[in-house]
Design a protein with these regions (language model features):
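DNA-recognition element of transcription regulators
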Residues: 106-119, 155-165, 190-209, 217-223
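Charged docking surfaces used in two-component/phosphorelay signaling
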Residues: 13-24
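Conserved acidic carboxylate
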Residues: 9
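Receiver (REC) domain active-site loop signature in two-component systems and cognate sites
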Residues: 56
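Basic, amphipathic DNA-recognition helix from helix-turn-helix-like DNA-binding domains
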Residues: 66-132
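Acidic catalytic/metal-coordinating carboxylates
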Residues: 34-37, 60-63
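Active-site beta3 strand of CheY-like receiver
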Residues: 45-51
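Short, Lys/Arg-enriched segments at the junction into DNA-binding effector domains
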Residues: 4, 115-172, 178
């Protein structure tokens, strides 16, 4: 069965090109021309994944995703954007984006990123390892990070969960930045490296209730989780 994609993009010529390319990959694509229409179509279609432009008339991609994430934390969302500042990336991830792709982009890279997000969504838990991180317990399959004393649970965005899983698997060791970028983004360009920095900062915030937990940056090499 084909995967349902909601593509929200106000450049209709670009949207048509992307739709045609995705349909050759067995995706079923619906197009919305702005955030307001995208929000309406989301509730009608309940797509398997959303690909959303940031800058649009009537309602921006940020506003649309903020509304969706009030009730849906699971459906993968990938932002398309010409906005490359760290603040923009932070805003997107804070709103619940799973990935970012900078315009202009190559269709094969978009397809790879979409399939990676969908693969996480549909994967089955088989012998999932539960990690204890100081005062926290982390289930990488469900992306649940639970504080053991308060039992407060945070559902991490998929990309943050993937990063934390790699750090937990190599606790006390350096996880090379390049490895994380290639595994999760497919390339190690500057834009993705800045996105990784943003997500590491967010993970530090999630874990800040235990002062003994540190994620350190080994300059020019990678990241290390210390307890």
């Amino acid at each position: 069965m084909s995967c349902r994609v909601l593509l929200v993009e106000d450049e209709l010529s670009l949207a048509s090109i992307v739709r045609d390319a995705l349909e050759t990959q067995d995706f079923e694509v619906a197009i919305a021309a702005d955030g307001a229409e995208g929000l309406h179509r989301y509730f009608d279609l309940r797509p398997d994944i959303l690909v959303v432009d940031v800058m649009m008339p009537k309602m921006s991609g940020f506003e649309m995703v903020k509304s969706i994430r009030q009730s849906d934390r699971e459906t993968p969302i990938l932002f398309l954007t010409a906005k490359t500042t760290v603040d923009d990336v932070v805003t997107g991830f804070n709103l619940g984006a799973n990935d970012y792709l900078k315009k202009p982009f190559a269709i094969p890279e978009l397809v790879v990123r979409m399939k990676a997000l969908l693969g996480h969504k549909t994967s089955q838990a088989k012998g999932t390892t539960i990690f204890t991180i100081g005062e926290f317990q982390f289930n990488p399959e469900t992306a649940h990070l639970q504080h053991l004393s308060t039992e407060e649970t945070t559902i991490l965005p998929r990309r943050e969960a993937d990063i934390l899983q790699r750090l937990c698997q190599h606790q006390g060791e350096i996880v090379p930045t390049q490895n994380i970028l290639l595994d999760l983004w497919g390339n190690d360009d500057f834009f993705n490296a800045r996105s990784l920095q943003v997500l590491i900062t967010r993970l530090r915030g999630h874990l800040s209730h235990d002062p003994h937990i540190r994620i350190i940056n080994v300059r020019g090499t990678g990241y290390k989780l210390l307890l």
